[in-house]
Amino acid sequence: FEISVPNRADLPKGKKVLMGMIPRSSDELILCVDSDFDFLFADRTEQSREVNNARYMFHTYAYATENFLCYAPSLHNVCVKATKNDTRIFDFVRFMHEYSCTIYPLFLWYAYSAQLSSENVFPLIDFKSAVRIGYLDLADNGEKTLEWLRRNVAKREEMLRKRNPKMIEPMKEFEEQLRGRGLTPENAYLFMHGHTLMDNVVMILLNSVCEKLRAMSIAKITASKKQGVALKNEMANYTNSLRSIRDVLLDNENYTKCPLYKRLQRDIEKYIARTIWNMKRSGA
């Protein structure tokens, strides 16, 4: 089925609007939002308390839906759909594991800064510039790119520690709380700002890998025994079959094995089961 959104400029948008609707939420008004940091923060902020205790609000657990789209085990299939080439030339799972572990210290600083209502220790714009990857060197599964990132992260972390020495100890307790909510160095990318992950990390990877895969496919066609019109037709058929990488990523549905998605799925299943039970009990 398809849900059509009314095309009206005066409709209120955003999470703040939905937060204001929590008191009115019910079986007739179910709210669905990106978690942002609210799941991780548990009861550290007023908004996180509201989100985590709202009976009729479902949230992503991951920072946003973009993080699901960028689930590492699903990215190879994005390349296959975009290039029509299923050759595995890059291990996305291994790279994202290393990437996530690398940016983990800065993620903690950014998250800690975000939950402070009066201080702006490490704002989003600085986090973005520190964890983005400007390029991907495919050799050795991106190791040179990761080395470049590690140097940048180390410099930024050292600067933050020097500027904010009194925050180092409180951050240790903060980290323990976040780990209690399921955060690990390996899955930190699922909890980071979603558009930063998609636009400044994953799209860089996909563009580089897909460019190589397309070049491989074209080289294979060119090296075939076909000539003249037959060769032109095969080349045209291939290029016409290609899809926009971003469009394929936005259509990605292969994140259903992600543990955070499964948790959301269980929440919905429990709600449906509870609703059916209540309807039967009331004779509806």
Locate predicted features.
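Acidic, divalent-metal-binding catalytic cores of TOPRIM
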Residues: 1-284
